[in-house]
């Protein structure tokens, strides 16, 4: 079967919005190639060997690729994509070049092409994210996590995930309960379990995410610790956690902040990321307004993570 690869050159800031445009157009899978995902290479020479050099050679900007089957309405879909991309700046997004190009490919070419950019990556002090299909010889102190995110979910190498992992390393102990909101591939819930949490719950609306996350939970043999649930945190979880982590987007974190306090134990920690730099103050103000105290702000590339706790705890 013939497919059309639609490639959009954009910015790190606009990657998620561009991917959503492609999904709305009916693409079968999205691949993201962003040189900013390897910004950590410059700061930690030990991780250099884990990075595919093809990413480092990219021209400035991120590439978002989606795949459409050849069909009678293909031209119309491409036009819709172009118009939708051109409209994104109206929402305050810097889309960079915003160039849209197409290429005819065979199904077998695109279904696994994204894997070539996903290599074992060390995050924080001890976590190593290893694709299930890659070989990796663990070093002393490494905590290896096996991941197969599928095409639709994060690999763990994005700045937002990296910052969340680094903060989880600080706050997880053997008696910790962790909630991971918008779990996707399940990576942060699994990290929590590997770091010693007694219980971790990952929540996601997407049934595909729930399936992928459960597969990764089994691959890491943490089924006795990690539970993946489909739905809204408020609807499917009735307990409280010591640590809640949400790697989503600023707008959703603002909404979550209205209720998150009721899901945190005394001295509970809320780790939020997926926040672009110019949204930091908006998120901080919402957290404080809803009874949380901001205790740390971390930035990496164009992204931020904010750590807060119940005020007065």
UniProtKB/Swiss-Prot annotation:
A single GO BP annotation from the record?
Answer: methylation
Q: Please give the superkingdom of this protein's source.
A: Bacteria
* Binding residues for S-adenosyl-L-methionine: 161, 182, 204, 247
Give the reactions, separated by semicolons, that this protein catalyses.
L-lysyl-[protein] + 3 S-adenosyl-L-methionine = N(6),N(6),N(6)-trimethyl-L-lysyl-[protein] + 3 S-adenosyl-L-homocysteine + 3 H(+)
Alphabetic keyword roster: Cytoplasm, Methyltransferase, S-adenosyl-L-methionine, Transferase
Quote the subcellular location field of this record.
Cytoplasm
Record's GO cellular component, any one? Answer: cytoplasm
Coiled coil ranges: none
Q: Which InterPro entries match?
A: Ribosomal_L11_MeTrfase_PrmA (IPR050078), Ribosomal_PrmA_MeTrfase (IPR004498), SAM-dependent_MTases_sf (IPR029063)
Provide the E.C. number(s) assigned to this enzyme. Answer: 2.1.1.-
Q: Give the matching CDD domains.
A: AdoMet_MTases (cd02440)
Q: Is DNA repair one of the keywords UniProt gives this record?
A: no
Function according to Swiss-Prot or TrEMBL = Methylates ribosomal protein L11.
- HAMAP family per the record? Methyltr_PrmA (MF_00735)
Family per UniProt? Belongs to the methyltransferase superfamily. PrmA family.
Recorded protein name is Ribosomal protein L11 methyltransferase
UniProt organism field: Alkaliphilus oremlandii (strain OhILAs) (Clostridium oremlandii (strain OhILAs))
* Higher taxonomy: Bacteria, Bacillati, Bacillota, Clostridia, Peptostreptococcales
């Amino acid at each position: 079967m013939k497919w059309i690869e639609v490639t959009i050159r954009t910015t790190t800031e606009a990657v998620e919005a561009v991917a959503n445009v492609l999904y709305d157009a009916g693409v079968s899978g999205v691949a993201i190639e962003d040189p900013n995902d390897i910004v950590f290479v410059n700061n930690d020479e030990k991780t250099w060997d884990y990075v595919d050099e093809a990413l480092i050679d990219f021209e400035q900007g991120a590439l978002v690729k989606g795949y459409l089957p050849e069909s009678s309405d293909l031209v119309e879909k491409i036009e819709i994509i172009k118009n939708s991309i051109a409209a994104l700046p109206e929402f305050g997004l810097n889309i960079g070049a915003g160039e849209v190009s197409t290429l005819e490919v065979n199904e077998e070419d695109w279904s696994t092409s994204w894997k070539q950019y996903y290599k074992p990556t060390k995050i924080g002090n001890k976590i190593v994210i290893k694709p299930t299909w890659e070989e990796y010889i663990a070093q002393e102190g490494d905590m290896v996590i096996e991941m197969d995110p599928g095409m639709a979910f994060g690999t763990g190498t994005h700045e937002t995930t990296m910052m969340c992992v680094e903060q989880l390393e600080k706050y997880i102990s053997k008696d910790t309960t962790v909630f991971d909101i918008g779990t996707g591939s399940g990576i942060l819930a699994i990290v929590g379990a590997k770091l010693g949490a007694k219980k971790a719950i990952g929540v996601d609306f997407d049934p595909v995410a729930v399936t992928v996350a459960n597969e990764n939970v089994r691959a890491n043999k943490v089924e006795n610790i990690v539970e993946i649930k489909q739905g809204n945190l408020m609807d499917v979880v009735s307990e409280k956690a010591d640590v809640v982590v949400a790697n989503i987007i600023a707008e959703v974190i603002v909404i979550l902040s209205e209720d998150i306090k009721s899901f945190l134990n005394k001295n509970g920690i809320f780790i939020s990321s997926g926040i672009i730099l110019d949204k930091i103050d908006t998120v901080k103000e919402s957290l404080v307004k809803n009874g949380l105290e901001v205790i740390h702000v971390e930035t990496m590339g164009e992204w931020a993570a904010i750590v807060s706790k119940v005020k007065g705890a």
